[in-house]
């Protein structure tokens, strides 16, 4: 059994884990082995997980369980707290009123429960679909319909930006444009889309 923990960068698997999974070493280590994937993100991880699954499939390494720990607070609150954490290095209550950033200590402490679930099936030597169902039931994976919808759209847009910026002689200018786009998307477009989604869902 392999426990594969990875980071998500801009809705995709990080460059280090992607580079590893595309290496000959990964093929040697993972071939034919069951894999448990583990990620800790702000709130969007599904598209990255799909890409991880595709790369593991090429190594004949089936995913038998996935644990995706996230910041459970409101999207825009988590933006503020994560930025505070990143730029100060302090994982405290921003301004004394906001919650702590990232995955909660409670969720991290409870992660051992998922390990016990995996261990039971590992000792038997058979991994069944019930394992993932148990993890979901215990909160090891949460899917929010609105965030999933937003993530799919953002993933496509990030791909467009990446193709525009990579190798461009106007790289610095385009990066500034991307920076401005992120602010626009997070603080203006997302609330509008969320309101429209809230009004129409589940119509």
Segments from the language model and where they lie:
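FMN-binding flavodoxin-like domain, especially the glycine-rich phosphate-binding loop
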Residues: 2-203
């Amino acid at each position: 059994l392999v426990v594969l923990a990875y980071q998500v960068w801009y809705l995709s698997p990080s460059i280090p884990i992607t580079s590893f999974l595309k290496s000959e070493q990964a093929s040697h280590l993972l071939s034919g082995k069951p894999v448990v994937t583990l990620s800790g993100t702000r709130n969007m991880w599904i598209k990255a997980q799909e890409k991880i699954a595709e790369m593991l499939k090429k190594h004949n390494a089936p995913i038998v369980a996935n644990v995706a720990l996230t910041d459970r607070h409101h999207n825009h609150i988590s933006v503020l707290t994560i930025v505070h954490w990143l730029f100060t290095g302090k994982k405290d209550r921003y301004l004394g009123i906001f919650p702590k950033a990232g995955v909660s200590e409670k969720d991290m402490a409870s992660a051992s429960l998922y390990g016990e679930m995996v261990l039971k099936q590992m000792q038997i030597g058979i991994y069944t679909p019930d394992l993932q169902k148990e993890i979901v039931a215990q909160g090891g994976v949460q899917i929010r319909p609105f965030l999933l919808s937003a993530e799919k759209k953002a993933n496509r847009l990030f791909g467009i930006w990446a193709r525009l910026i990579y190798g461009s002689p106007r790289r610095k200018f385009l990066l500034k444009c991307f920076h401005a786009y992120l602010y626009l998307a997070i603080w203006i477009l997302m609330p509008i889309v969320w309101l429209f989604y809230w009004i129409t869902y589940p119509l």
